[in-house]
Amino acid sequence: MISPQDLEGMSFEQALARLEQIVGELESGKAELERSIEIYEDGAALKAHCEKKLEAARLKVEKIVLGQGGAVSAEAAEFN
């Protein structure tokens, strides 16, 4: 089981790689029921962690704007 401390220390890429491993293991059908339940729970936690990291990254993205007189500024990017 992945602890909250382990999750906090994981980068997006690390969490995504582990999530892909879990999906592969579940799709193989070779894991016993208890193991499947355990890794499914880990997968759900990893998915939430990845979504949190993506949302934080999205909020950091800024759009560079060229204003009057050539002044450059940044403003929050709009995503639809």
UniProtKB/Swiss-Prot annotation:
Q: Which Pfam families match?
A: Exonuc_VII_S
Its EC number is: 3.1.11.6
Where in or outside the cell?
Answer: Cytoplasm
Name residues in a coiled coil: none
GO MF, one example: exodeoxyribonuclease VII activity
Main location, first listed in the record: cytoplasm
Give the reaction(s) catalysed: Exonucleolytic cleavage in either 5'- to 3'- or 3'- to 5'-direction to yield nucleoside 5'-phosphates
Keyword Cytoplasm attached? yes
Q: What is this protein called?
A: Exodeoxyribonuclease 7 small subunit
- Per the UniProt record, the source organism is Caulobacter sp. (strain K31)
Q: Which gene encodes it?
A: xseB
